[in-house]
UniProtKB/Swiss-Prot annotation:
CDD domains in the record: FMT_core_Met-tRNA-FMT_N
SUPFAM superfamilies for this protein: FMT C-terminal domain-like, Formyltransferase
EC number of the protein: 2.1.2.9
PANTHER family xref list: METHIONYL-TRNA FORMYLTRANSFERASE, METHIONYL-TRNA FORMYLTRANSFERASE, MITOCHONDRIAL
Protein name: Methionyl-tRNA formyltransferase
A UniProt-annotated Pfam family: Formyl_trans_C
Matching InterPro entries: Fmt, Formyl_trans_C, Formyl_transf_N, Formyl_transf_N_sf, Formyl_transferase-like_C_sf, Met-tRNA-FMT_N
Record's function text: Attaches a formyl group to the free amino group of methionyl-tRNA(fMet). The formyl group appears to play a dual role in the initiator identity of N-formylmethionyl-tRNA by promoting its recognition by IF2 and preventing the misappropriation of this tRNA by the elongation apparatus.
Protein source organism: Wolbachia sp. subsp. Drosophila simulans (strain wRi)
Residue sites binding (6S)-5,6,7,8-tetrahydrofolate per the record: S109, L110, L111, P112
UniProt KW Hydrolase keyword: no
GO molecular function: methionyl-tRNA formyltransferase activity
Length: 299
């Protein structure tokens, strides 16, 4: 089977790696163009780009697939199927119709729940008890195509964005191979649009004094490693935390261990990171902190 693989971030790496070891032929890899990164602003290739080059596979980095020249190039690869995993570009109808078996997508949620760009974060923020992977046929809608295969698992207490991301990436690659091995036997199941909800891209990682304690706790897990508080205009990331039901004045740092009183409970930071420093335990962090900072309100 001739496959075009379309993906960019680390989530897609497991799937590409498995395809490269399979009997199928990956004829081209489509990924986002390198972006300037770091202090030197050197172009940084996506994880998928790096693996494709190491495997001597042609890499394509179009800025859009809406142009006829790009569509003709795609057609000339003569794909039987296109596999999409967090690619980052919209696939127009002309592209969707080229492969014999269409374009199939690896989506890290139990569709139709959490269609959109940030399903893992929203799964955690909502307090969902389970999650999973949906292998779906792409159409012109937003993650609205029929489902080819779906598998779920329970979310564990200690799961955060990273652990769920890694579990879903592994499950997605395994499920993808099952679908491809039975591609002619698949019976697509139409999604129930009435059950759909959407996972918009997350851009605000701050924990606010007005947040309920459970919301703040979920933010720590959902936004790992980016959730933060601000004290005296300093940004402090909270990488791990717990919480308890006891609470006092909302938004206040209630003791020298930086326990944060919020609505409905107290957030208990366990691992934190000050801007420009390495992560450390809350105990080590407090030892190196000005005493005034642990008597303030978060901003």
């Amino acid at each position: 089977m001739r496959i075009i693989f379309m993906g960019s971030p680390g989530f897609a790496v497991n799937s590409l790696s498995l395809l490269l070891k399979s009997k199928s032929e990956v004829v081209a890899v489509y990924t986002k163009a390198p972006k300037p990164s770091g202090r030197g602003q050197k172009p940084m290739k996506s994880p998928v780009h790096v693996i494709a080059e190491e495997s001597n596979i042609e890499v394509c980095t179009p800025i859009s697939l809406k142009f006829s020249a790009e569509q003709e190039k795609f057609r000339n690869f003569k794909p039987d199927v296109a596999v999409v995993a967090a690619y980052g570009l919209i696939l127009p109808r002309e592209i969707l119709n080229i492969p014999k078996y269409g374009c199939i997508n690896i989506h890290p949620s139990l569709l139709p729940r959490w269609r959109g760009a940030a399903p893992i974060q929203h799964t955690i923020l909502a307090g969902d008890q389970e999650t999973g992977v949906s292998i779906m046929q792409l159409d012109e809608g937003l993650d609205s195509g029929p489902i080819l295969k779906q598998e779920k698992f329970l979310i564990e207490k200690n799961d955060n964005y990273k652990t769920l991301h890694d579990k879903l990436s592994k499950l997605g690659s395994d499920l993808l191979l099952k679908v491809l091995n039975e591609i002619e036997k698949q019976l697509p199941l139409k999604q129930n649009d009435n059950d759909a909800c959407y996972a918009d891209k997350v851009e605000d990682y701050k924990i606010y004094a007005s947040d309920a304690c459970e919301v703040a706790y979920r933010k720590v897990k959902a936004f790992y490693p980016k959730a933060f508080i601000k004290i005296e205009n300093k940004r402090i990331r909270i990488l791990d935390a717990d919480f308890e039901a006891l609470a006092s004045e909302q938004g206040k740092i209630v003791n020298d261990n930086m326990h944060i009183s919020l609505k409905g409970g107290t957030l208990i930071p366990k691992v934190v990171q000050m801007e420009g420093r390495n992560p450390c335990s809350i105990e080590d962090f407090i030892r190196g902190l000005k005493s005034s900072m642990v008597k303030k309100f978060i901003e």
